[in-house]
Amino acid sequence: MGVVSFAQESESPVAPGRLFKALILDSHNLCPKLMPQSIKSIDIIQGDGGVGTIKQTNFTRGIHIKHRIDEVDNEKCRCKFTLIEGDVMGEKLRSAGYEIEFMDDGEGGSICRMLSEYETVGDVVFRDEDIEEGKEKATELFKPVEAFLLANPDAYA
């Protein structure tokens, strides 16, 4: 068993509050509309969107993941959540935690910082390729939302 952590940062011309609202607070409504080829639905299984809420993302390829929201700070545009079911949970991972923060870049846009921490099962080792694949999945979600917000400047304002 080991713990693997990595940080990822990306810049966006979209303001932090808009990205936070779209990607964190309203992802269950927006993401399936923007990415119907990969996301079938995102259902709120428990809660009201705040701390303790459990969301299930159903992918078009027939698998799902569930995550629990552990912390939400609307003022700081920050969220912490834990993957609790699906994907490689149990098989390769004992736990997976994430912290996402959208910060003002001083020019009207934002810097998105994501910290990921994985606790592996047994002697499973995360390879660099696994980490890169995780970063690519995050980008696949981020870019369509960013494009939508740029094309719709009043959305999530």
Q: What does each model-found stretch correspond to?
A:
Residues 16-17, 47, 70-78, 101-111:
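A short, structured loop/turn motif at beta-sheet edges
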Residues 30-33, 40-91, 148, 152:
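Glycine-rich portal/gate segments that line the openings of hydrophobic small-molecule binding cavities
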Residues 1-50:
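Hydrophobic ligand-binding cavity/cleft-lining segments
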Residues 19-23, 55, 69, 112-114:
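Hydrophobic pocket/interface hotspot
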Residues 8-10, 65-71, 95-104:
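Hydrophobic/aromatic beta-strand elements that line small-molecule binding cavities or substrate pockets
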Residues 1-2, 103, 132-157:
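C-terminal helix/juxtamembrane-tail motif
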